Amino acid sequence: MQKKFLLLISMLLLVAACQEKEALKPPPSKNYSQTATSQQEDFLYDLSISKPTFTEGKSIKITAKLTYVGQAQNVTIYHGGSPFLFNLQETTRNFEIPSVMDTPLITRILERNVPYEEVYTSGGVYDEFSEPKLVEFMKQTMKGHFPKGHYIVKGSTDFYTEDPNEQKTEYKPSATIEFNVQ
């Protein structure tokens, strides 16, 4: 009986010790990264936001840049309506704001070390089967108004190049940033 009692006390101390460590974890940082960069071969992709926290109703500027850093003076890339995709997730409500892309093939020449830049334009999608909260949320984001919440921006590029033998090389560098709307 005494062994069982000691075992029970030991288990309680172990559980209490684990809970104590859990309580000491710092809260998640509210200083979100304003810039993220990734490189795939001769291409740098930068995703940035003007500041980490915004007031509801104020404009939010999210920028993507693609820079060719190779040896040639320039390179031709091929992509859809834009080489950039901006997929957003609002984590408070768990809503996704997907990137929608036109599908024409566009040819663009990038000069070495000169960034090509685009700014995120508001988006959102819903249909007649979407829940009313999602519809209202998307209507606001489509007008460029982000409701209060925490947002994760998963930015990426999607393009390819061709060599003189018409061999395609695909590129899809990506980066992630976050921001809050209060």
What are these regions (language model features)?
Residues 25-54:
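Low-complexity, acidic Ser/Thr/Pro/Gly-rich terminal tails and inter-domain linkers that flank the onset
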Residues 14-17:
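C-terminal motif of bacterial Sec signal peptides marking the signal peptidase cleavage site
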Residues 80-182:
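Extended, well-structured beta-strand/loop surface patches
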Residues 72-80:
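Short, hydrophobic/aromatic beta-strand segments
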Residues 19-21:
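Bacterial signal peptide processing site
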Residues 66-70:
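Asparagine-centered strand-capping/turn motif at beta-strand->loop junctions
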Residues 1-4:
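Positively charged n-region of N-terminal signal peptides that target proteins for export
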Residues 58-62:
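Structural beta-strand segments of beta-rich domains
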